[in-house]
């Protein structure tokens, strides 16, 4: 069976955004399951992909509406990761063309440990939790220095139920700025 992302990319979220650098954690579910899309960062696709996935289009739309950012012409979010945004999925692999096919096979324990390590950081961090699966992690997030932002998932199925207009990006910026983090 073909598995995505390629083996060398599975842990990219942690490589690109080491624990000491995390300012924001955006929690996704599982990787994109078509070829040449997933590369280890939630919501992100490789720069060679001409099509920006619908959820990411909606994230860009909210970013534009909230902060006036220009909508990029690709879906490659490595720049976010390099700036301290941990783009973590709760499950890190998927069988080709089968969404959620690797749920319940052990990745959740691993990614929960990452979430717990972020929760233990004694500095301000923002969590953006979009959709119920991401929000199911809230009981693990006990650090009073951290900001938890919740909204429906940016998928076209739920974006109009409150993802659009959630203003998470400006709230995160204000919180980090207030705490002296650029």
Enumerate the language-model features and the residues they cover.
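Charged phosphate-binding loop/patch that engages nucleotide di/tri-phosphates or the phosphate backbone
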Residues: 178-182
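A polyanion-binding, active-site-adjacent surface
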Residues: 1-129, 133-136, 141, 147-150, ...
């Amino acid at each position: 069976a073909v598995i995505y992302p390629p083996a060398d990319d599975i842990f990219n979220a942690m490589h690109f955004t080491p624990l000491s650098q995390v300012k924001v954690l955006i929690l996704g579910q599982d990787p994109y399951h078509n070829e040449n899309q997933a590369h280890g960062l939630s919501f992100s696709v490789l720069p060679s992909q001409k099509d920006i996935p619908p959820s990411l289009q909606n994230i860009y739309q909210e970013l534009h509406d909230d902060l006036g950012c220009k909508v990029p012409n690709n879906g490659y979010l490595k720049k976010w990761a390099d700036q301290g945004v941990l783009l973590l999925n709760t499950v890190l692999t998927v069988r080709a063309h089968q969404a959620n096919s690797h749920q319940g096979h052990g990745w959740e324990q691993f990614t929960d440990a990452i979430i717990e390590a972020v929760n233990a950081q004694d500095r301000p961090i923002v969590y953006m939790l979009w959709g119920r699966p991401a929000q199911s992690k809230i009981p693990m997030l006990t650090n009073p220095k951290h900001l938890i932002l919740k909204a429906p998932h940016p998928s076209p199925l739920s974006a109009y139920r409150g993802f659009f207009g959630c203003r998470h990006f400006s709230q995160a910026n204000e919180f980090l700025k207030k705490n002296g983090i650029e």
